[in-house]
Structures are given as structure tokens and as C-alpha cells.
Amino acid sequence: MSKTQRSDGDAGSGVVTAHNVGRTYYMGEPVHALQNLSLALEEGSFTAVMGPSGSGKSTLMNMLGCLDTPDEGTVEIDGRSVGDLSGAQRAKLRGTKIGFVFQTFNLMPRLSAAENVTLPMVFNDVVDEGRRERAQTLLERVGLGDRLDHAPNELSGGQRQRVAIARALANEPTLILADEPTGNLDSETGADIMDLFEELHDEGRTILMVTHERHIAEHAERIVHLLDGELDYIEEFDSAGVEDGGPKTAQPTADESIGTSGGDAE
């Protein structure tokens, strides 16, 4: 396996770019969740992030998803510095550019599958007449065209995650952020969900996925490894052996870089 570690802070450019990002939380003693971290997500790329609890994975996802802002450095989405935006502007950017998929699905229990999918459209001021039709199209896309009016408690775990993926696609985001998307699923259902993520990637979606599971991470084009808040190494894969069932082959990274980072509480 090839490994690459760089700390020059030059992330290049992408759909989302972090430049020398730092984030410290104050809970008694300061916790340096991220330090001098740089990363670019290129359009259409599929990146997995791995590392033990406390390694900075969740903080990194929160920064790239405009759920938090750095103390140091900058995060840019489509060339716009997130730190220069107001809270309302960040919320608007988050709602239009980013789709989230969570381990616990985070569906509204009293709403139907279709109504859950329409929620991001409501917040994005999509006209009412088009919401139901788009929700139906998206649910059909994830194999739930016959479950539009089912409540979450009437769906299996895998079906609920499919609803969550459809919801993430509601506003045609530039980026999909997935936090342990198979963590609450059995292995067979998790494999089905990863097949769906691969289909989305094949369609040109940009995906960042946090996972603890190596076999899940290997669905990505590269794996960014964090350890104790710092970059451990980055793997990039070619397709050798994939079509005939063989393992992916790790290749050294040439252009991407991450600096060091501190730990966070997941």
C-alpha cells in the first residue's frame, strides 16, 4: 500500500476547499479539533475519511458543510469564503449547495417519505406545485416509488436511509456529505446503500463520506486517514482488479494535501 503525507498547506482548488483550517473548542482545557488542515474536493470526486473517534472527522465534515466556522484559515465553496457570509447566507448556501446523509437518518417521524423529501425544497422556496412531483421522482430514483406515503416507522432501516438520500438530493446539491451512512444497517443493506452512492458518483456527484469501516471506504476514489487529529496518510485508488473482483490498488497522492489537525469529540 502506498502512503503520502504532506503538510505544505497547498490544497489546490475544488468544489469545496479548506485552506489551513483550525478549530479549537473550549471545554475546560482547550481542545484543538483541527489545526492547519487543507483539503480540496474536486468536482465529481468521491472521498472517504477514516480515523478513530476523536481524530477530527466530524469537525472536518461540519466545516465543509457550513455547520461550523473555523477559528483559523478559510473554507471556500465554489470560490466563496464561508467565513465572510452571514448566518443566513451560510444557511442558504448550505441548503442549495450541500446535501447531508446521516447515520441515524434524521427523518421527521410524523411526515411521510415524500413530505420528508420535500422539506429542503420548502426551505429553499421551491414552488409548492413542483415539490411533490420532484419528491416522487427522487424516491423512484432510490427504489421507493411505492413508498411515497409511508411514515418512517413503516419503513425498514435501509428504506429510511434511501429516503434520507433522496432528501439530500432535493435541491440538486453540488456536494453530498455522508456521516457513517451504513452505520445503523446490516451488511447486506449497507452494501445496497453503497451501490446507490456509487451510482450517484457515476452520475458526477461530489461525495465526502465519513466511515469507520474499511470495506465501505474502499468504495471511494481515495481515503483520507486522520489519527489523533493529524493526517496519517492518504490513499488513492486506481481501478486495477476491480472489474474482475480483485482488490483496489492504492496509489500515492500527487496533488492533494492536508496539514495537521487536532482531535474532536464525535
Model features per residue range: what roles?
Residues 1-22, 232-266:
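ABC-family P-loop ATPase nucleotide-binding domain
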